[in-house]
């Protein structure tokens, strides 16, 4: 409820007197002089005028008392000396209290008062009573203003328990009443008496006390006004208590902790260290609201999920019900079958028994017995036959099903058998064709010594169309190489000592049945060509990689072969004296199909050819040129599928005469693809050997064609061992032709492929440069589809080479560059690296070409290569071309390629650098399909003319990067870490990828949203310390009737508006018990109402009501009894309900027996409150609604609808009305009676209600404020009083002067009185106190902070003199009977405003 505001009114004496108002209406407060002067003309001095003494506004109880004082004899009743003594005593108490309060605590500043000291000093004259009262009024006004300001600064509840505050309130109204009394008396008309010494001394004491009060006020003024601006900006209705302030601070701290705990990226704008300003608090609350919104969204999603789950659960329930019904049906059928069998068996037994009895009794003949037995046997046989037939039918069905299944399995087995037979036929055909091709190759590749120049390098024999179980088709090109007999047994012996060990050799037995394994082991040279092909759509691309491996003397590293996935094979075919061609299973070789498919693949996609002019060597023989051109033509026929680009590179061999190439720098390219769970490892190890062979033998024994078909999840490890030998080669072209290695490796999507080429130091002396170039050359063309990553590491150690003919070398190596696939959106990261060396250069052009090649190397993110700095280059052209060869590797889209080029220490003597440079150029054109990007790290040395000496220092530093630092690989989540010798340091970034979409539970835990639930209305209530608006309460109980009522009562400790309970209790009758707890009233539920209406069991209904409601409320049954037994039922009613409440029937008796019945009536009800407004209002509600309203709102206030019923059912409805509202409300008939008998009725009514009130005036008053009465709420508890005091009664209709007396605690003086009509208090909360007819007014004086509601004292005053003490009186009655609130509710109970 809203707090009360203070208003000040001025009296005729220029003394401002405060009057309290509220938005709901006026309370029962003392009347100002102006209001009372309006009614002076209406007052009848002959009648007794009550002086109302109002209790102090304590936090414990507010009780109204009445003290009738005759206005004509006031001067005799109030002796001046005694009154002044009491006032001085109280002023001393107030001063001591204020000194204790304000002497130590200077918190309350206030606005200065304009007051002259001469006004205070003038009061010491004491000429008349009016001047003294005026002074007191001014002083009380000042104190009231100070206290009102204190109330605005958060210490109101301290003063509710402070005696000084109570005294000021009491003193204010006391002075007001004394003024009015003195104004209406004739005492002021007479001459004032001569001043007495005691009076003078008392007045002097009062002046001193006033001066001390002024000092205290000045202390309060000294406080700075800066803090007041913030504090006074608060609303007037805010409860400002120290506990509330502490709770606010605690809540602010909790808010900061909450924000810190739940601070995320979007909430970090709100800092917990901001100053406590309105803006910062707004931001904090906004942040909290955002968190709550997130929680609300999460809750909404959870609710939606719950709805879906509920729907699924209902569906499951329905399905379960259907199944249960079906089960019941089946059980019923089964039971029927069992019953029929039982019936048949029982019938048979009964028949047998009956037949036996008949045989014994009647003595039937044997023929009849035989007939009966035969009939029984027939019946039994029939039953058995029926059962057998049923069983046979069931077995027949089962057998038919089994037969169907067996037929299906047989068909499947047949299909599988046919499939296997067809596969075997295909395999036999492929093997036969392999043998024929081998024979053709043997017949065509016989070469002698130096005549090998005229032998063609390659012959394309056929194309195999391979279809495997997975439905994939691969096309293989079969190349035949000439067979050259070995002329040196030393080479064979050395090479046979180091054999190649691989688990893939076990697979050779399935394909190469005609091969002898010992021949494979004794071969001196190995050339592995791995071909990994998969059937792809025309939009997909295919790469082929060529790898040339020479035989080795010593194998430095063990050969590691990756595990093969299911349906994948790894085939390693050696090329020994007769050339061996390995093919996959189920291959159908057709030369025509090979040609057709070659043409289709050649012209599928737009091709891009890039030609370099070929300059013939001056000293080159024509035969050499022819052989080179043939090899180039063969290599140019390698095509790609759609979306691929073809790039043919023709280098220009420059042939200076004999140049010895001491060391050749080859870069090891490392292409690591980490997309799938596959890895391809290629290790090319070149050990050191010193071998001397003729060219024909060397060339033919080192060619090995590997066709490896692998599908997804295939790991292929190819180790190419290239021995570093010291060779003296006689024939050049034979060596050049046989050194060519074609490695076609095509992996399907998500197949990582890793190639490591390792060439250790070698000391080679080659007679012919072509043979050496081919043995050294390793071309890796690794094609991966989109979504792959290739990392190639190429390492080139120092070598000592002797090359005679460079042209053949350059031309042959140029052939291997034609697996080029340049799809759209290539990404090519090129970081040129230059080695800072101190070489001895003969030809500057060759050096520049080598450097150009080095700068085209691709390294991902910081790849470095640190070469050695002791190398000698004879011709820079050859070196530059060498480097150019290695730079043309393109990685697929969305991937990065790491290329590390290491140029170690070399001593190079180049005979023909042009051929060497072209050799290197051939190796670098490895192009991978997919969406790729080109990143070029430009350098100034991109031309042939620039040498190492012209490089800048920073460009040389780039060449000194180590390959170990380029380990940043970009991988997908599905890739696995690839470990090998050269790439073991590379981290697998796929394992470190964070979760992109965290789950909701993770967000809740990270944001600590699970702790937000604890912040509920109670904590907010403690934080705000405020009562919500009534409109909010109106909506809340209606929407949440079950849970909000108790919460509202406990949280705010206030009486919730009555209208809400009315509406709610009508619509939700089952929640009335909860309403009873909220309003602390006995609520009668519907069950009780129905029980009350039972006429057959009146006694049980009464006891049940007494036990449940804790009130002696007798409802409809008593009404019925009082109709039949008017006299006897009155006593029964009084005993039953514990009160002298005589309803309806007495009203009829009062009309016939006015005098006697009035007294009895007055004794019965103890109150005489008549409300005329109720007559007009109680017209539209039924009987049940009357009880409901009374119990729901906890007041005896029936608003309007009852009177219409009372007119039609006067006897019963009046009793019902009285029971419903719990008050003695006298309706219609007494009002008419009082009007007709005014004189006689006044005294009995005065005795009845405890004060003499004119009926007509009270009616007018109650019309506007029907729910408040001066006397009916006397015994109410604090919580109920708060609800009442938020409304005020218009005092204009009172005919008397009212004086409020608020005594303080004084244990020395006690007043006890026992009324002759006093009876023992009943169990009801409301207690009745009556005085005899000789008393004109009752005064109830409770102790401050000690007296509870429902206890009072009666003081009898003579009509002439009043002798009483203003301080408090001691309570001699027992403990109060009202209910004690819960501790939580008591803390939150606010105190009324004044």
UniProtKB/Swiss-Prot annotation:
<feature type="compositionally biased region" description="Basic and acidic residues">
    <location>
        <begin position="491"/>
        <end position="500"/>
    </location>
</feature>
<comment type="function">
    <text>May play a role in tumorigenesis.</text>
</comment>
<feature type="region of interest" description="Disordered">
    <location>
        <begin position="819"/>
        <end position="842"/>
    </location>
</feature>
<feature type="coiled-coil region">
    <location>
        <begin position="383"/>
        <end position="421"/>
    </location>
</feature>
<protein>
    <recommendedName>
        <fullName>Coiled-coil domain-containing protein 7</fullName>
    </recommendedName>
</protein>
<feature type="compositionally biased region" description="Basic and acidic residues">
    <location>
        <begin position="722"/>
        <end position="736"/>
    </location>
</feature>
<feature type="compositionally biased region" description="Polar residues">
    <location>
        <begin position="546"/>
        <end position="571"/>
    </location>
</feature>
<feature type="compositionally biased region" description="Polar residues">
    <location>
        <begin position="663"/>
        <end position="679"/>
    </location>
</feature>
<feature type="region of interest" description="Disordered">
    <location>
        <begin position="634"/>
        <end position="806"/>
    </location>
</feature>
<dbReference type="Pfam" id="PF15368">
    <property type="entry name" value="BioT2"/>
</dbReference>
<feature type="compositionally biased region" description="Polar residues">
    <location>
        <begin position="780"/>
        <end position="790"/>
    </location>
</feature>
<feature type="compositionally biased region" description="Polar residues">
    <location>
        <begin position="711"/>
        <end position="721"/>
    </location>
</feature>
<feature type="coiled-coil region">
    <location>
        <begin position="308"/>
        <end position="340"/>
    </location>
</feature>
<feature type="compositionally biased region" description="Basic and acidic residues">
    <location>
        <begin position="830"/>
        <end position="842"/>
    </location>
</feature>
<feature type="compositionally biased region" description="Polar residues">
    <location>
        <begin position="437"/>
        <end position="446"/>
    </location>
</feature>
<feature type="region of interest" description="Disordered">
    <location>
        <begin position="345"/>
        <end position="375"/>
    </location>
</feature>
<keyword id="KW-0175">Coiled coil</keyword>
<feature type="compositionally biased region" description="Polar residues">
    <location>
        <begin position="521"/>
        <end position="538"/>
    </location>
</feature>
<feature type="compositionally biased region" description="Polar residues">
    <location>
        <begin position="503"/>
        <end position="513"/>
    </location>
</feature>
<feature type="compositionally biased region" description="Basic and acidic residues">
    <location>
        <begin position="583"/>
        <end position="600"/>
    </location>
</feature>
<feature type="compositionally biased region" description="Basic and acidic residues">
    <location>
        <begin position="363"/>
        <end position="375"/>
    </location>
</feature>
<feature type="compositionally biased region" description="Basic and acidic residues">
    <location>
        <begin position="791"/>
        <end position="806"/>
    </location>
</feature>
<dbReference type="InterPro" id="IPR029272">
    <property type="entry name" value="CCDC7"/>
</dbReference>
<feature type="compositionally biased region" description="Polar residues">
    <location>
        <begin position="464"/>
        <end position="473"/>
    </location>
</feature>
<feature type="compositionally biased region" description="Basic residues">
    <location>
        <begin position="349"/>
        <end position="362"/>
    </location>
</feature>
<feature type="compositionally biased region" description="Basic and acidic residues">
    <location>
        <begin position="695"/>
        <end position="707"/>
    </location>
</feature>
<feature type="compositionally biased region" description="Basic and acidic residues">
    <location>
        <begin position="447"/>
        <end position="462"/>
    </location>
</feature>
<feature type="region of interest" description="Disordered">
    <location>
        <begin position="431"/>
        <end position="617"/>
    </location>
</feature>
